[in-house]
Amino acid sequence: MGYKFMAYGGYFLFCLFFLLMDGWRGMGICLIIVGLALLALEPYKIKAQKNIDKLKENAETLKHFDGGFNPDNFFNTYKTKIAFKESDSLVKIYQLNKDEHIEEYTIPFSNVIESEIALDNQIISKVSKSGIVAGGLLAGGIGAAIGGLSASSIQNEMVKSVTLKITVEDLGKPIHYIDFLPTQEVEGYNIQGYKKDSNVIQQALTNAEYWHGVMDVIIKKANKVAQ
């Protein structure tokens, strides 16, 4: 904080130099106005940085939470985490609630009913315990996902959300959502969405495809055991 105080102090001394010079007072006044505006924004910048730091801390907390589970693989953001362990036939989903407590959901493979991927709330692929398969993501990969966007999305060439929805046999918590794109609270969030060919979208689709594939395999395994 000390270096900022010195920087602003030097800036206003610089402005004072112009104020004391004939013919340059207008410039000095303009520079002071700009400096005051920047100074007024400083608390908001500090608050935003604290929020970013907190989200990063939350992401790290979720990443290392329940380390004893030793999953085969996991994915986490600052508010959710999904993991699975084939030898235990378990999926675990963790969610950070508003009170910053981590809620843990343990889901046996046999309890996974359905998995679907949606781009901008439009379902592009779905697998179900009933055997229903929709969309072409698993068959055609990321290219199929992009091709499955609506005409309006194609015209806009922007995607705002890539979401995995998992339905399970649990009346207390039957539906879980995993978001693969940055949300509004995250640094770098773009309110307009992200271009379809951007690295952000490609990575989000790769992650979504993988976890959707994991759910597909889990559902098939459970169906074989039930037969």
From Swiss-Prot:
Assigned GO CC terms: plasma membrane
Subcellular location: Cell membrane
UniProt keyword annotations, A-Z: Cell membrane, Membrane, Transmembrane, Transmembrane helix
Highest taxon of the lineage: Bacteria
Topological relation to the membrane, as annotated: Multi-pass membrane protein
Coiled coil residues, start to end: none
Major subcellular site: membrane
The keyword Cell membrane belongs to this UniProt entry's keyword annotation: yes
Listed transmembrane segments: 16-36, 131-151
Protein name: SPbeta prophage-derived uncharacterized membrane protein YomJ
Protein source organism: Bacillus subtilis (strain 168)
Lineage of producing organism: Bacteria, Bacillati, Bacillota, Bacilli, Bacillales
